[in-house]
Amino acid sequence: MTDLLNYSHLAFPKTPLRIGITGGIGSGKSYVCAKIAQRGYPVFYCDDEAKHIIRTSSFVHDRLTALIGPDVYDDAGQLQKPVLAAYICSSKQHAAEVDSIVHPCVAERFLHWCEAQTAPVVFMECALLYESHFNALVNLSGYLRIAEGWNISFTSGYDSPSIRKAMRFFNGLKYYSSSKDGHRV
């Protein structure tokens, strides 16, 4: 399994300033990042990139098939989301195994994306900024917090059992905002 803490093999761009945005489900990450993008700043969406990589990368396809089995993709090569979700949700170890395949690919894509940007500041929206250790890829990070109860109203379009399961997971995590050197901001 790849050591998620070690991104030293990747070439970090000298510019632009990279700011990570994270927060719990329904905290407003997407809303804030949409407003940032409206102001002309580039925003990299980690979840979207991870989904794209899982669907299109032959490397990831081969690794997930070897890990989970041939049913994770159908005969046409299309991801079978229920199979992947069942595997990930069955244990923390399984989730970590999938993360060890996908997260390094997302990190590499983010750094290449940064190199192509001309803006002095770029943003990364990442629900799992600290858990994925992507906070090591940004200069500053910010955690969006919203009053308890409000976030559920923002996520009401999702399946309720899924929301409850996700909230139980995220409620067990601790967050803070920090600069890359670990000082709280």
PLM segments and residue spans:
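Glycine-rich phosphate-binding loop of ATP-dependent small-molecule kinases
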Residues: 1-78
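Short gly/ser/thr-rich secondary-structure transition/capping motifs
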Residues: 2-4, 104-107, 121-127, 167-171
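Short loop/helix-cap segments at secondary-structure boundaries that form the rim of catalytic
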Residues: 36, 131-137, 176-182
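Well-ordered beta-strand positions
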Residues: 42, 48, 140, 183-185
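Residue-level signal for inorganic ion chemistry
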Residues: 47, 98, 123
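ATP-dependent small-molecule kinase phosphotransfer cores
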Residues: 51-119
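P-loop/Walker A phosphate-binding loop and immediately adjacent motor/lid segment at beta-alpha junctions
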Residues: 96, 104, 108-115, 154-185
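ATP-dependent NMP and nucleoside kinases share a basic, alpha-helical "lid"
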Residues: 108-116, 122-157
